């Protein structure tokens, strides 16, 4: 009996593998928090018997069956933890330059892939599905066209106009602040006017600059001159996965092919390294975790800022875990520094009290999942909007990166740690965030395999995705109505003038006859 069950189990495994799809995932992106979102899905798909080929900068430490990696981490132009404070100031002050940098970085990713002989070897391979990231350009969309395979895109941020627009999903600037803005949901007239300007600017920049002539020229050099325009391929995207959830973001109208998977990267906490475990276990007053993400080098901040953090932390009864690049830096006795910390596992520890963060989307969602209140120091991109939304919910306070004094840091940390309402509201938000019919990972897996089964999901797409921009905005209808109204007014005016003229002419004739 046991032998028959073993044979049946082996047969099931073989059948699931033989029916597995060939999937290509394109994630050369150099921010590990961005890749973590895709990684959770890709590893699960591989475990379910699909053959997953992934271009990545973060290869697995241990081989995963059915997951075949093309490691581009050593490529020129890719660098993790590379943003220094001086460059950070430029990014903060110039949103337009920030967006152009996103576009240039996306093209760099494509150049790295297109110049890699291992990627060239799979260019003509037949894939059943292609998965890519929404960032600054879709110069890699040609892989889906080459295989005649459906395309799924993943956005590791809250909803952006350029991501929603490709799916035919409404993105209304009247109540949807653009991702870089600091506007509230309820905007006044001037904020709505500025928001509309930014909204149109980003749409133009993404589709006509990010996916414009230069991107097409580069892609056609790799895929062939018969490749369609990038935007044409992008508007055929089958699904968009968005790493957010309506409980932490304002509710949006979403079409069926835009699916929220907020928190897909959050895992069950694993045992911590012994030193960190001991440090946290023995923290009588709890632990504060401080990191500004994988992109920014905290050690390059001005000396007075670093000193302000040291002095503030020294006065706290809590212990502090600080992600800091220079591990030889002299620190207070209650501070443990490392170049890297297992963030997800730290959040799962019972003694964690607060999270000092830049407000990056992935880390913020981990904090929400585990119910850890936030002291936010937003730097760029979506981080201000993320932190401001948490401040509005009463689960975070905001610190200005250009005003990081000892007193400000101490005041913010003490407020969040000592005022229990922050922790209580974050735990309530965590319950809302977790309360779903399916886990975000199960949701993503289901819809990915749905697209594979049906060879695309174009039946989920609204007709809005195929309208010209002036049709989508009803500018042609509005123009017609205005012209018709003006013509009607002109005709009425002409008739009235004619009638008046006729009346006065008749009156004059009558008077002349009487005289």
From Swiss-Prot:
**Substrates-to-products reaction catalysed:** kermesate + UDP-alpha-D-glucose = carminate + UDP + 2 H(+); flavokermesate + UDP-alpha-D-glucose = flavokermesate 7-C-beta-D-glucoside + UDP + 2 H(+)
The known PTMs are summarized as: Glycosylated.
Task: Write out the GO biological process terms.
Answer: organic acid biosynthetic process
Q: Does the keyword Transmembrane apply?
A: yes
UniProt GO MF annotations: UDP-glucosyltransferase activity
The enzyme class is: transferase
Q: Which UniProt keywords apply?
A: Endoplasmic reticulum, Glycoprotein, Glycosyltransferase, Membrane, Signal, Transferase, Transmembrane, Transmembrane helix
The entry annotates sugar attachment on 51, 236, 303
Topological region Cytoplasmic: 493-515
Topological domain (Lumenal) residues are 21-471
Q: Which GO terms describe its cellular component?
A: endoplasmic reticulum; endoplasmic reticulum membrane
Keyword Endoplasmic reticulum among UniProt keywords: yes
Q: Which cysteines are joined by disulfide bonds?
A: none
Known EC number(s)?
Answer: 2.4.1.-
- Any signal peptide, and if so, which residues? 1-20
| Membrane-protein topology | Single-pass type I membrane protein
| Major subcellular site | endoplasmic reticulum
Instruction: Write out the annotated subcellular location.
Output: Endoplasmic reticulum membrane
What are the TM regions of this chain, as residue ranges? 472-492
Q: Which Pfam families match?
A: UDPGT
Q: What else is known?
A: Carminate, also known as cochineal dye, is used as a fabric and cosmetics dye and as a natural food coloring.
Summarize the protein's role.
Answer: Membrane-bound UDP-glucosyltransferase (UGT) which catalyzes the C-glucosylation of kermesate and flavokermesate to produce carminate and flavokermesate 7-C-beta-D-glucoside (dcll) respectively. Carminate is used as a deterrent against insect predators.
Provide the family line.
Belongs to the UDP-glycosyltransferase family.
Return the protein name.
UDP-glucosyltransferase 2
């Amino acid at each position: 009996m046991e032998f028959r069950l073993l044979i049946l189990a082996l047969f099931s495994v073989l059948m699931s593998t033989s029916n597995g799809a060939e999937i290509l995932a394109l994630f050369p992106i150099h921010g590990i928090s961005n890749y973590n979102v895709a990684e959770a899905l890709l590893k699960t798909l591989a475990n379910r018997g699909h053959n997953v080929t992934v271009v990545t900068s973060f290869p697995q430490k241990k081989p995963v069956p059915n997951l075949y990696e093309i490691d581009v981490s050593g490529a020129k132009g890719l660098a993790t933890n590379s943003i220094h404070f001086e460059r950070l100031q430029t990014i903060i002050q110039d949103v337009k330059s920030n967006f152009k940098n996103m576009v240039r970085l996306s093209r760099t990713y494509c150049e790295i892939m297109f110049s890699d002989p291992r990627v060239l070897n799979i260019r003509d391979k037949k894939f059943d599905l292609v998965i890519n990231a929404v960032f600054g350009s879709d110069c890699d969309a040609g892989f889906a066209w080459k295989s005649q395979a459906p395309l799924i895109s993943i956005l590791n941020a809250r909803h952006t106009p350029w991501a929603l627009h490709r799916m035919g999903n409404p993105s209304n600037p009247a109540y949807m602040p653009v991702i870089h803005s600091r506007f509230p949901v309820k905007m006044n007239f001037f904020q709505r006017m500025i928001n509309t300007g930014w909204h149109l600017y980003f749409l133009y920049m993404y589709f006509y600059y990010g996916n414009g002539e230069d991107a097409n020229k580069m892609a056609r050099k790799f895929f062939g001159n018969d490749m369609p325009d990038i935007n044409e391929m992008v508007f055929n995207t089958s699904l968009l996965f968005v790493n957010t959830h309506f409980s932490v973001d304002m509710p949006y109208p979403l079409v069926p092919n835009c699916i929220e998977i907020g928190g897909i990267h959050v895992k069950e906490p694993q045992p911590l390294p012994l030193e960190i475990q001991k440090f946290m276990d023995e923290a009588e007053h709890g632990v504060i975790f401080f990191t500004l993400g994988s992109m920014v080098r905290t050690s390059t901040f001005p000396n007075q800022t670093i000193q302000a953090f040291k002095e503030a932390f020294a006065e706290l009864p809590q212990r502090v875990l600080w992600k800091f690049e220079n591990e030889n830096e002299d620190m207070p006795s209650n501070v443990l520094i490392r170049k890297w910390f297992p963030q997800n596992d730290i959040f799962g520890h019972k003694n964690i009290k607060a999270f000092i963060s830049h407000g990056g989307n992935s880390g913020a969602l981990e904090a929400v999942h585990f119910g850890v209140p936030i002291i936010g120091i937003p730097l760029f991109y979506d981080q201000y909007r993320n932190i401001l939304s948490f401040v509005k919910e009463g689960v975070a306070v905001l610190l200005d990166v250009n005003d990081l004094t000892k007193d400000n840091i101490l005041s913010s940390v003490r407020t969040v740690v000592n005022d229990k309402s922050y922790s209580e509201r974050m735990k309530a938000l965590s319950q809302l965030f977790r309360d779903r019919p399916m886990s975000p990972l199960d949701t993503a897996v289901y819809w990915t395999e749905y697209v594979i089964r049906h060879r695309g999901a174009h039946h989920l797409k609204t007709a809005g995705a195929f309208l010209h921009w002036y049709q989508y905005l009803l500018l042609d209808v509005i123009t017609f109505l205005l012209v018709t109204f003006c013509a009607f007014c002109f005709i009425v005016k002409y008739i009235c003038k004619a009638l008046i003229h006729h009346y006065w002419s008749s009156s004059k004739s009558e008077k002349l006859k009487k005289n």
